Amino acid sequence: MEAAGGLKRWIKPAAGLALVLMLLTQLQPAEMRRVLESAQWSWALLALILASLANLACALRWKAIVVKFGQPLTSSSAIVLYFQGVTANTVLPGGIIGGDVWRTLGLSRLGMARLVAAQSVLLDRASGFWSLSFLALSAFLLLQVMGQGLAISAPEALQILYGAGILIMSLTPLALWRISPKLLHAALSSAGISVLSQALTIAAFCCCLLAVQAQFSLLTVVLLCAGIFLAAVIPASIGGFGSRELASVFFLTAIGVQAESAFLGSVLLGLTATAQGLLSLPSWLQCEQNEKNA
């Protein structure tokens, strides 16, 4: 049983590594080297700042949800737990615990029932997805109002399927009213900061793309970011790298972005999370030490 659990723990990073290696075999090393040599690292630095602000907003979104669930939680505690979760996801690939589970356990240590704590983390995740869909739908409507067509090189059926998925996800919060009005109120209480957090994340991604000199339409990238970031939840990544890079290449090459730039832009975004995870590592280690000494 223990061996099976250990094997399961390594499936996700192994799949992520396989995805990255598969992508690398499809890219041109010489072109990747050229892109990196001409990269504008000031954009990457700005991306790190924006990504950090995005995670800060995510932590405050989660705090608002937890408070609506009836658990007192200070902003500082929420921020510490959230960034420790980033460490668990990025610096400890395939390791002891995932970021969402870490946050759930953190709330349970503060006295919150574990099931309710897990619900708050799940609703926090869902709120982020809804915000991505809302921004994508808004970008699509703006493109229509501005009379700009969608220059997407993909089968029409796939475009319709993607659009339908975005629309459905944008409307799914309405289903919470039938499931639990309490959940809907908790989601609405953090809606504004949730949209802000996702807008900051998209801005960070755009900065990463600009760092590797990708040329793109901002509104079209906002439209496609829902698919790119949602792909990141697929359990096939190592340290946060894998499924997002595959989705980035898939979606962005459809709008004319060079495959190498799409891949490297996504990798740069992942490195902003890795940097934040490393900065939060001392806090994570201290918490682990306190648990052992308790």
Task: Please tell me what each predicted stretch does.
Residues 68, 94, 104-110, 252-254:
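Helix-loop junctions at the membrane interface of multi-pass solute transporters
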Residues 1-83, 132-134, 138-234, 243, ...:
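Predominantly cytoplasmic-facing regulatory/coupling regions of multi-pass membrane proteins
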Residues 56-61, 94-103, 233-248:
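Transmembrane helix boundary and interhelical junction motifs in multipass membrane proteins
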Residues 87, 123-126, 230, 271:
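Transmembrane alpha-helical cores of Major Facilitator Superfamily
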Residues 86, 90-97, 125-137:
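Mid-bilayer segments of alpha-helical transmembrane spans in multi-pass integral membrane proteins
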Residues 76-80, 95-99, 109-126, 257-268:
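Membrane-interface alpha-helices at helix entry/exit sites of multi-pass transporters
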